[in-house]
Amino acid sequence: HGTRARIRSCYEYVSFLEEYLADLPNLTMAYPEETAVTSPIETWSDDFSMAIAGVPSMVNDFTGGSFMETHYHSQFDNDEFYDEQVYRLHHELFALLILALDETAVVPLQFSPVVQRIHKGLEQCRDICYRADVTGQLGDRRQILLEKIEELESLSDKALRKCREDYEQIAEYNRNYRQMLHEGRDAEAEGLYEQTRELEQKLLVKFK
């Protein structure tokens, strides 16, 4: 698994997972480096079919180390290779993650990473327009294309701000919900949960 444990997820879960890791207590020490989040999910992974069906997903990532190349699905992945510390860390890590997700009123999806990738793609398109070999081929159309790119960048900037504002609202709902649960205010928590059903449905439709 390399030098650290990793949670691989869809882009939209990254913010929530990073916040989750930041608030973790000390877990079993199995790696020299701290646990990290990586994205996106990979097409060969079992959870890919879930994500494209509209279910936000995450998995225990193990493609960053040699295990995938030397042991996975082979006769070498046996009792001798078993590591007690790694076993305990991953059970602690994902058990606490399940509890954290269980204490959310709204699915904690943050769409700004997707918009950031769109913005990066537009920057790359603009850079290509200035390449000498492309400039000659585009001719007068280059300026039109650059104007369209600028227009799309402006729209993506607005979308990025909106995504961040929306996530702050989601995070606020979830903070309040968690506090209600911890304080035993179950009726209020249930009321907040019901209040946010429409919002959650919109988020899941947007994800799909």
Short names for language-model regions:
Residues 67-119:
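His/Asp/Glu-rich mid-to-C-terminal helical/loop segments that flank catalytic regions of hydrolases
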Residues 22, 26, 52, 95-106, ...:
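Sec-exported extracytoplasmic/periplasmic mature domains
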Residues 1-71, 80-83, 87, 136-196:
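Metal-dependent peptidase/peptidase-like ectodomains
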Residues 17-20, 118, 125:
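Generic structural signal of hydrophobic/aromatic residues within well-ordered alpha-helices
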Residues 201-208:
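Long mid-to-C-terminal assembly/interaction modules of large eukaryotic proteins
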Residues 121-141:
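Surface beta-strand/loop "capping" patches
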Residues 37-47, 110-121:
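A glycine-rich phosphate-binding loop feature that marks nucleotide/adenosyl-phosphate handling sites
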